[in-house]
Every structure is written in structure tokens, then in C-alpha cells.
Amino acid sequence: MKRNYSGILAGKKVALLMGGPGKERPVSLNSGAAVAKALRSIGADVHEIDISGPDFTLPEKTDLVFNIIHGTFGEDGALQSILDGVGVPYTGEGEVGSRLAFDKIASKLKFDEAGVPNAKWEILTGGQSTSISIPLVAKPPREGSSVGVHIVQKAEELSAALEDCFSRDSEVL
């Protein structure tokens, strides 16, 4: 059964957080514009806030924070911790869930601990060679979306992929 929740936000003050400090800032700003339009179409009182870090101000009597910040700060638990601290409801998962989902190493450890099947993996910290056979995927563990992801099909591609990943994080998954 399809449900219509559009009336829930009509007249509510919604702080739409977008931008952020990460590499996904342009995508977040585009997403923010689309979300602002959609929220206004259902009657929400939308306040668009372009932020680049933890120093931002919410409008007084904000009813809801709609987080559309992708990647670092918006999805890594940092923003959620701030919002939990001021007691404002927000979209998405809480601080702990955000931290676990954003850090792919922490996620993999939890999957393994819970017995959830997942692809073979290892952590590289530099100067190591991988024990995983090619083809493989190399990724900085704390980047959002597909930032820094490399699908390595040939052995000669591995060095450049790892170099790029290490330019983004001190570990590679």
C-alpha cells in the first residue's frame, strides 16, 4: 500500500544541510537543490544551509534537520554527534551507525563478527603487498560513494591504484 507522508512536513521548519568539506561537496549541493525544491513542494519551510565543517548555526526552533551532506562530516558520524548533542531530530542513521557504515574497515569487522558473508578483504598500511588475487577492488576505507575506488584487472594496475588510495587515506581496503 502506497502511503503519502507529504503532510507531515507542511509548515515545519526544516534546516537542509548541504555542501560539506569533502570531495563530494558539488554532488551534495546539487542534491540539496533538488531536495529543497521537493520539500517546498510539500509545504515545508526550508532553510538551505551550505556548511563546510562543524561551525554552523541552525535556525531557531528548527523542527528537523535534513542532512544531504555526502561523505566526510555528513556521513561519518561527526554531524550526527553534533545534532545529537543539541537534541534536534535529523534524517538518516545516528552517530554509531553512521561511523560504522562510513568506515569500511569497521563495517567489514562487524560483518565478520556477525557471520555475515562478504568479499575477502585485508587492510594495507603501506609498503605491503596484497595476498588477494587479481582481479580485486582497492578503496580508501573512509571515503564516501565511489571516491578513490579502483577495479584492478591486471597486476600492472595495482601500484597506481594503491598510490591513489594512499593519497586519500593511511589505510587501503
Feature map (PLM): residue ranges:
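Basic phosphate/pyrophosphate-binding loop/patch that engages nucleotide-derived ligands
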Residues: 109-118, 157, 164-167
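ATP-grasp fold ATP-binding core
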Residues: 111-112, 132-149, 166-173
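Anionic group-transfer/hydrolysis microenvironments
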Residues: 52, 69-72, 141, 155, ...
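ATP-binding N-terminal substructure of ATP-dependent carboxylate-amine bond-forming enzymes
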Residues: 1-96, 100-109, 113, 125-129
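Phosphate-binding site of ATP-dependent enzymes
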Residues: 16, 153-173
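Short beta-strand-to-turn element immediately C-terminal to the catalytic PLP-Schiff-base lysine
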Residues: 124, 149-154
